[in-house]
Amino acid sequence: MILPINTYSDEVLHQKAKPLKGVDADISSLIDSMFESMENASGIGLAAPQVGCSIRLLVLDVSCMKSYEDVPPMVVINPNVLAVRGKNLMEEGCLSVPGVQGDVLRPSEITLKYRDRNFQEHTEEFSGMLARVLQHEIDHLNGTLFVDRMEKRDRRRIQQELDDIAAGLVPADYPIARECSRGGEGPACM
C-alpha cells in the first residue's frame, strides 16, 4: 500500500522515534508499504516518521545508482552509529521537503549497529552514498531534517520554499500527508 509522505512542518518529523522491540505482522506490512511508497516517490531512502510512524525503522534501496547496483535493499531497525570517519559535503534532497535541495556536510564513513527485517543484529561499516543515505534517514529517526544541517545562510536562502511546503503550496508527484492523524501511534506503527 502506498502511504502518504509527511512533510517539513509535520510534528512527527521533529520527534525522536521510539525503538522497536521486534518485528510482527504489522511492522512487516509497514516495511512492505514503506518500500512501495519509496519506490512510488522515486526515493532511495524512507524513514518510518516520514509515513507518520514514530518508530526507529528505515528502508533504503540505492541499487538505482550506478556504483550500487549490487547493493540489495535494506531494512534498518534501531540503528546506532558507533563511529564516524572523514567528511564529505554533498547536495541532498528529501521526500519530506519536496523540491528543495541543499548542501550538507556529513561523515564519509560510518560504523553502524542495527537490526534487520528479521530482527537479527548486525554491525557493519558503510561509506560513500550508502553512508550518506543511512545518516540522512537516521536523522529522521532523531527528529532532524537535512535542512536543519544546512549552513545558516543556505537555510535562509530556502526559507520561503520551506514556508510554502508548510503551507501546503508545494505539489509532489507522490501522495503528501497533512499532519498524520495517527500521531505516530496507530496500529500500523506498533
Swiss-Prot record:
Keywords: Hydrolase, Iron, Metal-binding, Protein biosynthesis. Fe cation binds at residues 94, 136, 140. The active site is at residue 137. Pfam families: Pep_deformylase. NCBIfam families: pept_deformyl, PRK00150.1-3. Removes the formyl group from the N-terminal Met of newly synthesized proteins. Requires at least a dipeptide for an efficient rate of reaction. N-terminal L-methionine is a prerequisite for activity but the enzyme has broad specificity at other positions. This is Peptide deformylase. It comes from Chlorobium luteolum (strain DSM 273 / BCRC 81028 / 2530). The gene is def.
